[in-house]
Regions:
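Solvent-exposed, acidic/flexible segments
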Residues: 39-46, 56-64, 91-94, 98-109, ...
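Residue-level signal for alpha-helical context at structural boundaries
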Residues: 85-89, 162, 346
């Protein structure tokens, strides 16, 4: 009796899934039919395509499907350049892809993301690599993740447009790479940054290479939702820093991981160099300003403090100079990454600032002596100025 009940339940589930899939396919057909009627003149600009989608469709699901349909149908895979993948080029123009009507994974993903975000479907381009069955692909890959309604789904418009067989590209639309759940997608795609697995228990790179799609460490909970919120509030540089930490903790398992992390660290160093140069230039400007103020003060002191200023006003002149030099030193102390040439420049500038501070101290001591000696005389000047 129990076996019979189980069989009935299984059959019911299969029928339900079949009906659900059939209904989904019918919805796809309806959306696809409308999307493929877009005037050709509108298909050479991502904004024009987005405008058409916004007019014809209202739900996020239909909009996402419309984009997937048009890209997989209209963009050819650039087989000749399949190995010319630049994961770190953020200047890939969607309109250039639309003009040529061909591209590799980065072009597909960037085009999808560009249009999706323009129609109000939050989308990110994700980079990583893939596997088919037990074979890990030795080329990096790019795909998308979209927030459709209230859930995150994985979308791979490149794989959805066709496949390679016997060194030939076969154009064949595949709906299996549209709106995939994260726990299913991880079986074939792993992002460099574990954040983009969208799993509370992300698998490691090593587990992926071993054919695992479920983490063995269920004690290590990862709150990807909160981490994503932090990511979205970060500057591009802080995103690099936090991403590099997550990537290292997830493991480096092949040259693709190493190459990706090396590139991130290189960009971090480039940023530090740029910031250090800006800090140095700012410090140099503060130093020049301080020297100008110091020379102005010395000229004033050499004229026996004429025209008259009160004791507190004169002391404030020296204090302002001290603050300016110290600001320059503070800028230099913020330096993170030093090249040998910049390190030498910073050393020389620090030396010059400290020498200027020594001179400033001498001027302060001279002022203290002068104010003490000329106290009665300055009181007379003060009284005459008040009259």
């Amino acid at each position: 009796m129990k076996i019979k009940t189980i069989i009935i339940l299984m059959l019911s589930l299969l029928i339900y899934n079949h009906n659900l899939k059939s209904q989904t396919n019918k919805n796809f057909i309806k959306v696809d039919r409308v999307m493929l009627r877009i005037p050709d003149s509108m298909t050479y600009s991502s904004q024009n395509i987005a405008n058409y989608i916004n007019i014809k469709f209202h739900s996020q699901n239909d909009k996402a499907r419309a984009i997937y349909c048009w890209i997989t149908e209209s963009i050819q895979y650039d087989f000749d350049n399949m190995y010319a993948i630049d994961m770190y080029n953020s200047d890939i123009s969607s309109d250039e892809t639309l003009k040529s009507r061909k591209g590799i994974c980065t072009n597909y993903a960037n085009l999808y993301s560009d249009i999706a975000n323009k129609v109000g479907v939050k989308t990110y381009v994700i980079t990583g690599y893939t596997r088919k069955k037990k074979h890990v692909n030795q080329n990096p890959h790019a795909w998308c993740v979209s927030m459709i309604d209230t859930s995150w789904y994985m979308i791979d418009p490149t794989w959805g447009s066709g496949y390679i067989q016997n060194s030939n590209y076969i154009k064949k639309i595949n709906n299996n790479f549209f709106k995939i759940q994260p726990n299913s997608f991880i079986k074939s795609h792993i992002p460099f940054d574990p954040l983009w697995q969208f799993l509370n228990y992300p698998i490691t790179k090593q587990e992926f290479h071993h054919g695992t799609s479920k983490s063995k460490n269920e004690n290590l909970y990862f709150n990807f939702i909160d981490t994503l919120k932090i990511y979205e509030s970060q500057s591009s540089f802080n995103r690099l820093l936090s991403s590099s930490i997550r990537i290292e903790s997830n493991g480096i398992c092949c040259y693709l991981d190493y190459d990706n992390l090396s590139d991130i660290k290189f960009n971090i160093k480039v940023h530090y160099k740029k910031v250090d140069k800006e800090l140095f230039n700012s410090a140099a400007n503060q130093y020049k300003k301080g020297i100008f103020m110091l020379n102005e003060y010395i000229g004033y002191a050499n004229k026996y403090y004429v025209p008259y200023k009160s004791d507190s006003e004169i002391r404030q002149m020296l204090e302002d100079i001290r603050i300016t030099f110290n600001l320059a030193l503070q800028q230099l102390e913020k330096s993170k990454y030093l090249t040998s040439s910049l390190e030498n420049e910073i050393h020389q500038l620090k030396k010059s600032i400290n020498q200027a501070l020594v001179e400033l101290k001498k001027q302060k001591n001279s002022l203290d002596k002068y104010l003490e000696i000329a106290k009665k005389y300055r009181e007379t000047l003060s009284n005459s100025n008040e009259k």
